[in-house]
Amino acid sequence: VESLLDGMEAFGFDDIKTYDDFSSRVPVKKYEEIVSMIDACRKGKQNIFWPSNIKWFAKSSGTTNDKSKFIPISNESLENCHFKGGKDMLSLYFSNNEKSSLFQGKALRLGGSRALYEDNNTYFGDLSAIIIDNLPLWAEYVSAPSHKVSLMDEWEVKLEAIVKETLNEDIRSCLLYTSDAADDQLG
């Protein structure tokens, strides 16, 4: 494990250019086998999982062994996975609905709770909170309720605040960060 903690050099990440390169050099591991690497990354050690700094960790609600897991989230994964999906969806929608008035109103934004915790200049919490905290500024102008209300912890209080903030808004779509919002709020 120590050689893995020395960084990506163990896998030769600098030379990985294709999927085949990656799959032949980086072994598939169970979470329990890399927990020490996750812990080191959460304590600020970099170049373990990704060449850029990892400062975000999505905290799972527990899966295989009923314990929460911390999943490293890079800026690149936010941009190229989580945000790209939304951009692709909007591109397809507008390609097929050229006269859409979607952006003449706002999107009702629902996400999990804002339970972000800072430790060693790294942060962990619900994936939806991480996504909402990192959305581009323009997303704030086309979404309701506010960032603060979107990430409130208590569902009943949050629901009242959502109604209050959106009652007079022209809501035309719904944004639901399903990775954990479904578990937290939709039962």
Labelled PLM ranges:
Residues 1-182, 187:
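Active-site phosphate/ATP/adenylate-binding loop shared across adenylate-forming ligases
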